[in-house]
Every structure is written in structure tokens, then in C-alpha cells.
């Protein structure tokens, strides 16, 4: 074919297109309209396959079978009844604590008003009272979850408080002081608390009731010395049980359970060279096999960022997060809150007593309502299987006089908390068996480290 023929063909096609341009345009327009209708119909009738996504969601829901409410994870550390002559309480009694919690949930507060916390003892002189002590200071929004404050009809602006004292007036009306010794403030309110019912439980208990002594830490003020903190210790030496428990096996399935729950897209998670470090573009999961502990870090949030946007209590965020990310496992209870850093801590409780071991703590850090860090133990004790239970042994613990003598070796301004707790150790030669030994512990120093109160060779601040 010569170039002249090619030219003639192109010229003919061009002329044909020109002469039929309107027809071609109409046909093309009709085609596009038909294509648009077909695509629209396809979108409306599309039935995508979500089976893989639903499988993942179902798996996560199946893993979280032990969700909890705020009131499920908050429990008093002590309940003391003063009968005008002596102080009494019931340590290590789960049933008693549960009954008190139910009473508190049903208690209404009304006609609340702010007062200074000075001269509390004078105000309670010659009165019976019940003191409910919590393990840490709690803010008003947390108390509003424990108590019925909707009908308070007054102000409830106390910054934080760690105890509530219920007492009967001469009119038999039950009032309450919600007290913060450290803030030197309190709220007084009328209540519907069943004072006599709780008093009768303690008076009628056939066993487990101990007599206590108060121990005050004082500070100097312009008006003289005043109580900055108050502890209660059993007056006489007393006995508690030590226990041994099997733990569930920790294997790849255990790691996968947390990996699937913590990462948004587990399929895109990369593992490190050791296989114990997992990461995606925004977070990481570090598994420590020596301590059987995991640490999840969210790189998009840092603990040093501005906290002004923290609009919700870190405790509420923590409970929601654990509920939605592989659950609780053993019974953990709220034990410490630092609102300034957004840090929340939970301790494992066994038969009413906390396990004091850093490797067993559950800790979450929040910045502006976003999680920045989550640490917890992979160890889960088998606490409900009688077939594999071990016989408990009696252990004698020190009296109030001995505790007070030991505290003379400490700077009381650095003593944060005192508690009876379990020391948790491996049984000799049995990696899956843990021994729990009750002891007195002190939370000491600016780093808030727990250590045994009674030691043979080391002084305050020594290693745990």
C-alpha cells in the first residue's frame, strides 16, 4: 500500500466522522448513560462477602467473656466500725466486701455541702461510725459511679478523697463525711446508708473480726498539728492462710490472643528477629518471657504530651479498654490513679488480699483519652479448680505495736501506703505452681515501689 492510498483512507474516514459527528455523539452518550445505569444497579444490589471480617469480630468477642463495670473493679481496702470504745474490722473477707459494696451502690446522697476536714475527731466524738477506706484517692466522677449522687441537691466538688465515714446523728439520720486528709477538704451529706445492718453484720460475725488501732501521720499547720493520713492496724498478731496455685500454660495461643486483640490489623503485624516483639506502623507489643509479661505501646501518643484534653477519667477508659481487648483473666481491682500522668494501676486479688508483685500489676497510661501504654502479666492462676488445689497453711502476721515499731525506721513523709498482701513466688522445681505468702508491705518513696515492711538485713528503700 502506497502512501497516497493511506492518505486517501484517512481523508475518507475523517470526512465520514465529520459528516456523522452528531450521530456518533448521540450513540456515545447513550452508551455512557447505559453504563451508568448498569453500575448504579450493581452498587445497589451488591452483597459483599464480610465473612473474614465477621470471623475476626466474633473471635474477639468470644475472647472477652469477663467484662466488668466500674463498680466491679472498685472495692474498699478496709472497713472499720467504731463502737465508741474500740475499732473492729474483717480482713480478707470477700463476701463481706461484696455485701458492703451492694449497700453502697444502693445508698442515696442528698443535701451535700463542702466543709474543711479539720477536727474530724471532735465532730465524731461520742458517735458510732463506720469508715470505708479505699486504696487510693478518687475523684468526684468516680464516686458518682459508686454512690447514688443524682439526688444530692448540693455541691460535690471535692478534688479527691480516699474514705467515707458514715455516722448516726441524734435524730438517727445517717450522715457521711467524704474526706480527703491530703487536700484538707471534705463533703458532708445526708444518706440512706443502712448503718445498723452493717453494724449487725460485724457484731454478729462468729469469726474473722479483728480489733484495730488507728495510726496517724500528722503535719504542722498554723492551727497546730493535724492528721494528714490515717492507717488502721490489727491490735494483736493475727493469722492468714498462705496458698499455692497452678497457673495456666503460656504458649503461642496466649500471645496470639493479645496480638489479635491489641492490633487493629493483626494480619499486617510484623514480628522481630526473636519472635517476641510485634509491631505495625503505629504500635508495638513486647513479650518478656522471663517475667511472663507484655507491654503494648501506642507510638501515636506519648506520656509527656499535654493532658488538657483528657476529658474522661483514665479509670473509665481503662475498664472499657480491658473489656474490649482480651478481658481481665483473674480478679483484678483498681488500686491506684494518677490523674496528672493519666496512669491507672490494678492489682490481682486472691481471697480478698492483693498480690504485691510488680510483675503481676496491670498498668495503663492515657494521654488525652488515647492509650499510650498497656502492661500486664500473662500469668493466670487456676483459682476455681478444687481438683488441683493445695492445702493452705497458717501464717502469723505482726501486731500493730510491731508495725509501728518497724515504721520508725522509715521517713513517714515518703510512706505512701501500707497493706497486707501476698508475696508471690515460684514453687521450687515447679514452674507452673506459685506460692502466695501473706506479709506486711509498704509503698515507699517517690517511685511508689512496694517492699516488705519487715526485713532481716535491708533498710528502707532496699530491693524487693
Sequence positions of predicted segments:
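Amphipathic, soluble alpha/beta structural segments
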Residues: 161-182, 347, 354, 402-438
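Preferential activation on post-signal-peptide N-terminal prodomains/segments
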Residues: 2-17, 26, 38-309
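Short, non-transmembrane alpha-helical segments in secretory-pathway proteins
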Residues: 96-108, 250-259, 303-341, 386-429
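Short helix-loop boundary/capping segments
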Residues: 366-396
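Hydrophobic H-region at the start of alpha-helical membrane spans
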Residues: 25-33
Amino acid at each position: 500500500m502506497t502512501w497516497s492510498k493511506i492518505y486517501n483512507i484517512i481523508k475518507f474516514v475523517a470526512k465520514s466522522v465529520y459528516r456523522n459527528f452528531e450521530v456518533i455523539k448521540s450513540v456515545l452518550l447513550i452508551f455512557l448513560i447505559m453504563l451508568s445505569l448498569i453500575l448504579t444497579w450493581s452498587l445497589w444490589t451488591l452483597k459483599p462477602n464480610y465473612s473474614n471480617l465477621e470471623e475476626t469480630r466474633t473471635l474477639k468477642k468470644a475472647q472477652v467473656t469477663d467484662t466488668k463495670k466500674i463498680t466491679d473493679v472498685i472495692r474498699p481496702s478496709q472497713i472499720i466500725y467504731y463502737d465508741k470504745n474500740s475499732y473492729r474490722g474483717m480482713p480478707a473477707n470477700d463476701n463481706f466486701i461484696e455485701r458492703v459494696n451492694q449497700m453502697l451502690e444502693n445508698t442515696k446522697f442528698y443535701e451535700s455541702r463542702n466543709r474543711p476536714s479539720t477536727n474530724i475527731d471532735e465532730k465524731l466524738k461520742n458517735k458510732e461510725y463506720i469508715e470505708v477506706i479505699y486504696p487510693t484517692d478518687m475523684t468526684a466522677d468516680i464516686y458518682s459511679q459508686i454512690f447514688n449522687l443524682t439526688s444530692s441537691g448540693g455541691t460535690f466538688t471535692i478534688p479527691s478523697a480516699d474514705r467515707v465515714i458514715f455516722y448516726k446523728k441524734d435524730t438517727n439520720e445517717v450522715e457521711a463525711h467524704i474526706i480527703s486528709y491530703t487536700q484538707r477538704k471534705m463533703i458532708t451529706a445526708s444518706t440512706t446508708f443502712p448503718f445498723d445492718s452493717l453494724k449487725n453484720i460485724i457484731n454478729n460475725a462468729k469469726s474473722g473480726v479483728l480489733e484495730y488501732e488507728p495510726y496517724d501521720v500528722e503535719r504542722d499547720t498554723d492551727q497546730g498539728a493535724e492528721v494528714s493520713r490515717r492507717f488502721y492496724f490489727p491490735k494483736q498478731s493475727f493469722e492468714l492462710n498462705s496458698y499455692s496455685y497452678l497457673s495456666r500454660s503460656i504458649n503461642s495461643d496466649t500471645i496470639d490472643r493479645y496480638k489479635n486483640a491489641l492490633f487493629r490489623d493483626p494480619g499486617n503485624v510484623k514480628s522481630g528477629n526473636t519472635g517476641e516483639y510485634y509491631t505495625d506502623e503505629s504500635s508495638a507489643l513486647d513479650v518478656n518471657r522471663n517475667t511472663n509479661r507484655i507491654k503494648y505501646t501506642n507510638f501515636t501518643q506519648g506520656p509527656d504530651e499535654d493532658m488538657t484534653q483528657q476529658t474522661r477519667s483514665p479509670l473509665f477508659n481503662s475498664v472499657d479498654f480491658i473489656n474490649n481487648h482480651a478481658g481481665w483473666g483473674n480478679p483484678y481491682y483498681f488500686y491506684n490513679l494518677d490523674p496528672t500522668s493519666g496512669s491507672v494501676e490494678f492489682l490481682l486479688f486472691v481471697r480478698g488480699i492483693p498480690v504485691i508483685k510488680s510483675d503481676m500489676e496491670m498498668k495503663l497510661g492515657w494521654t488525652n483519652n488515647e492509650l499510650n501504654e498497656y502492661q500486664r502479666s500473662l500469668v493466670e492462676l487456676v483459682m476455681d479448680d478444687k481438683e488441683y488445689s493445695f492445702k493452705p497453711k497458717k501464717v502469723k502476721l505482726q501486731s500493730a505495736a510491731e508495725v509501728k515499731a518497724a515504721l520508725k525506721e522509715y521517713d513517714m513523709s515518703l510512706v505512701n501506703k501500707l497493706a497486707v498482701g501476698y508475696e508471690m513466688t515460684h514453687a521450687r522445681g515447679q514452674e507452673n505452681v506459685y506460692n502466695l505468702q501473706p506479709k506486711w508491705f509498704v509503698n515507699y518513696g517517690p517511685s511508689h515501689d512496694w517492699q516488705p515492711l519487715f526485713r532481716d538485713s535491708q533498710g528502707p528503700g532496699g530491693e524487693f
